[in-house]
Each structure stands twice: as C-alpha cells, then as structure tokens.
Amino acid sequence: MAGDLLQPCGMKPVRLGEAVVDLLIQRAHNGTERAQDNACGATATILLLLLCLLLAIRHHRPHKSHIPGPSFFFGLGPVVSYCRFIWSGIGTASNYYNSKYGDIVRVWINGEETLILSRSSAVYHVLRKSLYTSRFGSKLGLQCIGMHEQGIIFNSNVALWKKVRAFYAKALTGPGLQRTMEICTTSTNSHLDDLSQLTDAQGQLDILNLLRCIVVDVSNRLFLGVPLNEHDLLQKIHKYFDTWQTVLIKPDVYFRLDWLHRKHKRDAQELQDAITALIEQKKVQLAHAEKLDHLDFTAELIFAQSHGELSAENVRQCVLEMVIAAPDTLSISLFFMLLLLKQNPDVELKILQEMDSVLAGQSLQHSHLSKLQILESFINESLRFHPVVDFTMRRALDDDVIEGYNVKKGTNIILNVGRMHRSEFFSKPNQFSLDNFHKNVPSRFFQPFGSGPRSCVGKHIAMVMMKSILVALLSRFSVCPMKACTVENIPQTNNLSQQPVEEPSSLSV
C-alpha cells in the first residue's frame, strides 16, 4: 500500500507544449514592462517634483516677470499705447494708464518698452540712483530743438551734461541766489507800475502774460544782462515750447516728411537765432567792459567757449534753456497759485496776516523769507495739488530691479509724480488744504523738483522767486479772476506740462 502511494521520485525529460512556452515568455515580457513602467513612473514623479520646486522658487523669489499693462496682442498693444501718448499727450496718457492698471505699468512709446511709475517707493528708487541720469525722447525731435546732447534739460550725454550742470549750479546758488529776492521784488513792482500794455478796454488784466514778463525779466537780469524786447522774446519762447512738446516723441517718419515738421523747425530756429543775437550783444558788452567784477551765467559760458571747453552751439542751447525754464513753468505755477488763493479766501487771509506780522511795515528782506511759513506751505500745497510739471522722463543705463520687477537696460521710465502726490500719506490727498503740510513731509512722498543726481538744479532759487514775487504782488493787489476762471474749470492741456489753453476771455482778471 505504501509502495503504491509513494512512488520513487525521478526526473524525466518532459517536452513542453507550445502553449506552455508562450505562457512563460508572456509572463517574462510582462515583468519587463512592469519594470519599465515603474522606472517611467519614478522619472515622471521626479520631474513633477522638480517642476513644483521651480514653481515654488519662482513664486517666492522677489523678481517678478509680468508687469501690469495693456496686452501685446500681435503688436497691436504697442501701436495703441503709442497712439494714445501722441494723441492725448504724455501727462494725460500716463494718468490714464496708472488709473487703469495701477501704480506700476508697462506700455510702449515708439515701440520701446516704457514703465510708468506712480508708487512713491518706486519713484524715489529711480530718482536717487545715477543709473537713471539719462532721459529718453526722439533723437530727431531733440535735434530739431537743439537739445540732443546739448544744454541740460534733455541732454543724455552724461559726461557733457555733468560739465554744463556745473555752470548752472554756480549761477543758481551763491551770489546769484542772494541777488534773486531783490531783483524779483524790483521787477515785479516795475511791471505793476505799468499795466497798460496788458490791460484790455474793459479793464481786465492778462495776468498770465504779466507773470511771464516778470519772470523773463528776472531771468535776463540774473543770467544774461542785455537789453531785450520781453514781448517779442516771449512769443518766440511760446512757439519753441509748443514745438518741443510736439516733436519730443514723434516717430522718425515724421521728420522725413518736410511739410509735416517745417513749421516747428522754423519756430525752433527763430528762438535759437534770437538767443544767438543776445549772446553776441553780451560779447560786445564784455569786450567794452572796463572791469569784470561779476560774471553772470552767460559770461561764464562765453569764456568757457573761448577756452575750448564748450562749443558755440552748446553755449547757445544752455542760455536758451536758462531763459525758457521759468516763463513756461514758474510763471504758470504762480498763475495757478493766484487762482487757488481766490478759491480759498481763508488761506489768502492767513498769508496776508503773516506778511503783515513778519514784514512789520518793512520791505522784504532775506531774513523774512524763512519766516513766511504759511506762504511756503501754500506754495508746496499748490505744487502738490496742481503741478505744472507733473512727470519726468528717464532711461535705464543698465539692468535693474524696481519693486521686484526686472528692468532691462534701455527701458524708458516715466515718473508720474503728480499722481504720486495724491497718495494716502497726505491727510486730504484729493483736496487743496494746508493741512497736508501741517507736519514735515518726507521727500519720498513729495518731489516737486525731483531729487538725486538729476534733480532740478534751480529748486532753491525757484522757491525764493515764488515767495518774492507773491509777496510783492499781494502787497499791492488782490487778484479777482472771472467766476469761471478756476483751476478745475479752465481748459488745460497736459502733454509736456499742464498748461491753460490761452483763451483771453477766460484768463483775464
């Protein structure tokens, strides 16, 4: 029984059937595929983890790649944004894009990437860095008005700009600054003594042109010192300024069509020729002078030219820019201030009371200027609430990072300072109120003249001029504009600067 149950064990060759062989091969193949699948799955998992890691790093790193702004959309975005700047003006377009996309916006001007900044920290970053001492604008446009690598305002030849800036700094500080108050007071009073040429048959006074006449006379006495026809020169300055803001960002094709820009080229040349004639008068004056106790701005430039330091064209452009700087900025600022005074009679009363208290019946002295604190707050609030120049244009000289955004070398920058001045730092940002300057305002929130290496070189003399002219004017007259003549109601343009549309009936007082 046991033998039947337990047969002897032996190994005998067995021929496997084809079906069995196929089954074994299939199992081996399936094992290989499973191994390959496992390897592929592991690789995919690793790649997925690496991708997540890269995304996490990208999310947490400070540099951002996408700046808010209009879409490129196959090149249509750059065309539309450029057309808006050309059509509505640089200032108006900048306000539009900041309002729509935020305080850091990317647009295009003439195909070039341009950032519009109104965030105070971003604006301050650009102002204080020498990386942004260059400006941008049409090369052919700047050549048309003589500003390409000449003068100081739009000169982007940094080495030459630094050289000529030294002449401006010397003229606008030191002895020149000390003489400013007396010259402003004398000029204002002499013009107020003879208002006949600026008064119409109804007794209405063209106050804006009065202020321009005063300012151009002050500029001549301080920096040029030759006889000139104020009204004739002001007409040429006005046409030059119109040309400046017209050609500044025009495309190159505009200048290849002579019939399009012929008028502007002629208007620019008229002022250049007038300034050349005034410089020649100055040379004759210097040649006949018995002694040279005081060398003004133009005299210093003439001697620099004679020593081979500056070209004749650069001397002409420097004098031209010194002469035009105030009539279309400071004079219009004063005009807006007078309108704001009449819209805020309580402020006018405070200023008049302060003048009576500080001057105490005396004529204005240098020692009085620092004591006119209410007047200074009024000037600052006027420059904040309704600035004439509410933006500045720069170009990046190297790669940089602004508020976490990568900025490439050559990027255009528009600092929308006027919009920045309406920030929540001020207690009443959207109202005209001296309360906004009740306490000290840090420079990063208030930049009427800029700061850093390319700040306005005449910012100190400008404050002296405004105080002196306002004191002289308010001591003798009260300005009463027509009812419709308010800062909010008068027609204005905002291209290169905010300027009233000069309709005589609306600007008379």
Swiss-Prot record:
Query: Does the record carry Heme as a key word?
Result: yes
Known EC number: 1.14.14.14
> Which UniProt keywords are present, listed alphabetically?
Heme, Iron, Membrane, Metal-binding, Monooxygenase, Oxidoreductase
PROSITE patterns, A to Z: CYTOCHROME_P450
A single GO molecular function term of this UniProt record: heme binding
Cofactor requirements of the protein: heme
Family statement drawn from the similarity comment of this UniProt entry: Belongs to the cytochrome P450 family.
Any one Gene Ontology cellular component term annotated for this protein: endoplasmic reticulum
Alphabetized SUPFAM superfamilies for the sequence: Cytochrome P450 (SSF48264)
What exactly does this protein do?
Answer: Catalyzes the formation of aromatic C18 estrogens from C19 androgens.
Q: What is its main location?
A: membrane
Q: Reaction catalysed by this chain?
A: testosterone + 3 reduced [NADPH--hemoprotein reductase] + 3 O2 = 17beta-estradiol + formate + 3 oxidized [NADPH--hemoprotein reductase] + 4 H2O + 4 H(+); androst-4-ene-3,17-dione + 3 reduced [NADPH--hemoprotein reductase] + 3 O2 = estrone + formate + 3 oxidized [NADPH--hemoprotein reductase] + 4 H2O + 4 H(+)
Superkingdom classification of source = Eukaryota
Which amino acids does the record list as binding heme?
A: C456
Q: Supply one GO BP term.
A: female sex determination
Membrane association type: Peripheral membrane protein
- Output the InterPro entries linked to this UniProt entry: Cyt_P450, Cyt_P450_CS, Cyt_P450_E_grp-I, Cyt_P450_sf, Cytochrome_P450_Monoox
Q: Where in the cell is it found?
A: Membrane
Does Amino-acid biosynthesis show up as a keyword for this record? no
Kindly provide the name given to this protein in its UniProt entry: Aromatase
Query: Pfam families of this UniProt entry?
Result: p450
User: Which CDD domains did the record assign?
Assistant: CYP19A1
